[in-house]
Regions:
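Non-membrane alpha-helical segments in proteins
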Residues: 20-24, 50-60, 84-87
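Ankyrin-repeat and related helical/solenoid repeat scaffolds used for protein-protein interactions
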Residues: 235-308
Length: 319
């Protein structure tokens, strides 16, 4: 594709609003020949609203010129333009754009680096693992968080020890939460590396981290986590209890029956539903009386789930 621009006369208007509408119309036409016009508006227009609009619409192009323009816009003087450029980079779908974006993942400016890593995560190119691993120890929390995201999406098992350390020791709760979720890429052979970190995360001071730990344990279903998950059924945050109930259902260990039956009386309907579902998965007849009570729950979703669990039990156990 050549980069010969077709110029809309409205772009010469002294009215920034007119120029912005022109940018929208040009983008809606989806004509590759108009790409230079959008790139030029992002680079050169004096009005913030025009540059911001150009950054927003350029996310639909994977051409190297668009990637370069968006990456450069991460250094724009206006925070709105920078934010739109970062969002647009995260919408890139063409893996070929990754080669243009890779150098920006090592940029000295943390916000630029984080945005580049976010874009690379969506593209899932193997070469992104190198700057991502380097960024795991960056001073900026947003950079560390995006680096974990890249490695998680790439399923980089080599990075699991470093990610496990972040899950338990990072000073930023959102980094710990993201790292805890990324530990779910572990294979059964890698459980020895990640299980201690997940059990520690299940006791984190931040409830979203604890919730993420229970969610990840539900994916990995290691039986060694049984006691920790039972303890999590007493967590102050119902969201953590819900994820723990899901994990216990997947473990299918009758030891969890008392905790799950107790959860059927929780005031939060979503938790009651998850407890009923878990009891059905475990398939123990001792849960029948509690499930029969839950089958008359005021919440229709709880009733439906409890009746399904009873049906499974009547057929001889979990599905």
């Amino acid at each position: 594709m050549t980069l010969e621009s077709t110029q809309d006369p409205r772009l010469a208007s002294p009215d920034a609003g007119v120029r912005r509408i022109a940018i929208l119309d040009i983008a809606d036409a989806e004509d590759d020949d108009d790409l230079p016009t959008l790139v030029g508006a992002l680079r050169d227009d004096t009005a913030v609203e025009v540059r911001a609009e150009a950054a927003r619409v350029l996310g639909g192009w994977g051409h190297p010129a668009a990637v370069d323009a968006l990456a450069n816009a991460l250094l724009d003087a206006d925070p709105g333009v920078r934010a739109n450029a970062a969002t647009a980079l995260g919408q890139l779908k063409d893996a070929g754009a990754g080669t243009r974006l890779l150098p920006w993942a090592s940029h000295a400016e943390p916000s630029v680096r984080a945005a580049a890593l976010r874009g690379l995560k969506e593209l899932r190119i193997a070469a992104a693992a190198v700057p991502a691993r380097t960024s795991l120890t960056h001073d900026d929390a947003a950079v560390r968080r995006e680096a974990v995201g890249v490695l998680g999406w790439l399923k980089s098992t080599e990075a699991l020890p470093a990610i496990a350390r972040l899950a338990t020791t990072d000073v930023d709760a959102e980094v710990r939460r993201t790292a805890t979720g990324a530990l779910g890429l572990s294979s059964e052979e890698g459980h020895a590396t990640v299980l201690p970190a997940l059990l520690a995360a299940l006791r984190d001071a931040s409830w979203p981290v604890r919730e993420e730990a229970a969610t990840t344990l539900a994916k990995l279903v290691p039986h060694a986590a049984l006691q920790a998950l039972l303890a999590a059924m007493q967590d102050d945050a119902w969201q953590v209890r819900l994820r723990a109930a899901r994990a216990l259902g997947r473990l299918r260990d009758a030891t969890a029956l008392p905790a799950l039956i107790a959860a059927l009386a929780h005031p939060m309907g979503n938790l009651r539903k998850e407890a009923a579902l878990a009891l059905g998965e475990i398939g123990a007849v001792d849960a029948v009386p509690a499930l029969e009570v839950a089958a008359a729950d005021p919440d229709p979703e709880v009733r439906k789930t409890a009746r399904l669990a009873l049906s499974r039990l009547a057929q001889g156990g979990a599905a």
